[in-house]
Amino acid sequence: MENFITLNPIKKINGTIYLPGSKSISNRALLLAAQSVGATRLINLLDSDDTRYMLAALLQLGVKYKLSTDHKICEIKGVGGSLQSKNTQTTLFLGNAGTAIRPLIAALSIKSHNIVLTGDMRMKERPIFHLVDTLRQGGGRIEYIERDHHLPVKLYGGYCGGNIVIKGDISSQFLSAVLMMTPLASKNTYIEVIGSLVSKPYIDITLSVMRAFGICVQHDKDYKFFYCEGNRIYKAPQEYVIEGDASSASYFLAAAAIKGGTIRVLGVGKNSKQGDIKFANILERMGSIITWGDNYIECSKGIMLKSIDIDVNDIPDAAMTLAVIALFTTNNLPMILRNIYNWRVKESDRLHAMATELRKVGAIVSEGYDYLHIVPPVQIQSAFINTYNDHRIAMCFALVALSNVSVTINNPKCVCKTFPDFFDRFLSVGNNL
């Protein structure tokens, strides 16, 4: 793939898409399978940069696994307890894979000594203070190597559980990371969440995967308090099927909502554990026609595609797709996306990046501390889109090609983080004739 890709105007949209495995579920399942008693066969594993970083780290930690030729099935033999480095000078490099590095920091804070975890330049910019502080409360000995509150870090073990307080308003990945290692701690763990919990559906994913591996966490209905017994062990479920990625589904469902025709995505459905399936409900509220099945969601264009004012804190990834859909709304009202501060601590500062790139194609955008106010253009303009090495920016701006102008996307290879063949799949449901 070249350093850019130009998508010419797409005239029609129609087809069926088999979704790649969920990134969030894939890396959670890999980590828990690695720490389980017994062997697990993971089916529909996502093959992407993020999962490859996790697999490489597990290999360095002595975990044995076997991948199918297409990397979508992984047979992994658990170590039956906490992960620990076999080498006192181990360094794990995890790129910009937040779903790998944060859970691994937590998992390795129990027993590992003198192990360093680091990432690429963007990952080093993403603060991890709240996770490190939480682990230190439980006895974890963690040292910042280059600058406070950021990667790289060196771990010296020591985490044992107990009473923990964690902020919930920065990233749900911090809470997920701590939750996944609570049963392996020597003490029972009581967690209190301070502030509003962002991206709550991702905590539901964590709890669901933990249940599949034999561990149930108690919590109140508001997700303010969690309790898990220590000195327990994960048990391999023998086989675990990973859902399709609901965030990735958003681009294809949006395409049908914008252009017409019908798109069916397979791999997620009405019983999905992923919060981003709520994206389909939002499309329906905006005027699209949605049909649900046990393992599919189908979208067709409605009479009008309406802008709305909505809190999208629960679906931060799919909400980016809504920002681009705003370009195509026809009810003469702005699209307002609220409660999205955590966009700023993702693979890029997504709030600023999205505002910048939307303006290039003609939208009038107001960027607030935690919101975007988007007025669609009278005529969408052709533009060269910077992706900031952010896979989701690249994928959602592909939707601009559903207008009557082309769009050129810089660094399309960044989609390898979660959806390596995205552009091929996207063009497969389009027709330029």
Swiss-Prot record:
InterPro entries named in the record: Enolpyruvate_Tfrase_dom, Enolpyruvate_Tfrase_sf, EPSP_synthase, EPSP_synthase_CS, RNA3'P_cycl/enolpyr_Trfase_a/b
Gene3D superfamilies per UniProt: Enolpyruvate transferase domain
Keyword terms: Amino-acid biosynthesis, Aromatic amino acid biosynthesis, Cytoplasm, Transferase
CDD domains, per the entry: EPSP_synthase (cd01556)
Record-level GO cellular component terms: cytoplasm
Binding site residues for 3-phosphoshikimate: 23-24, 28, 171-173, 199, 317, 342, 346
Name of one Pfam family that matches: EPSP_synthase
Sequence positions that bind phosphoenolpyruvate: 23, 98, 126, 173, 350, 392, 417
Positions annotated as active site in the UniProt record: 317 (proton acceptor)
Matching PROSITE patterns: EPSP_SYNTHASE_1, EPSP_SYNTHASE_2
Pathway entry: Metabolic intermediate biosynthesis; chorismate biosynthesis; chorismate from D-erythrose 4-phosphate and phosphoenolpyruvate: step 6/7
GO molecular function: 3-phosphoshikimate 1-carboxyvinyltransferase activity
Assigned EC number: 2.5.1.19
Reactions catalysed: 3-phosphoshikimate + phosphoenolpyruvate = 5-O-(1-carboxyvinyl)-3-phosphoshikimate + phosphate
Subunit comment: Monomer.
Function: Catalyzes the transfer of the enolpyruvyl moiety of phosphoenolpyruvate (PEP) to the 5-hydroxyl of shikimate-3-phosphate (S3P) to produce enolpyruvyl shikimate-3-phosphate and inorganic phosphate.
Family, per entry: Belongs to the EPSP synthase family.
Protein's recorded name: 3-phosphoshikimate 1-carboxyvinyltransferase
Name of the encoding gene: aroA
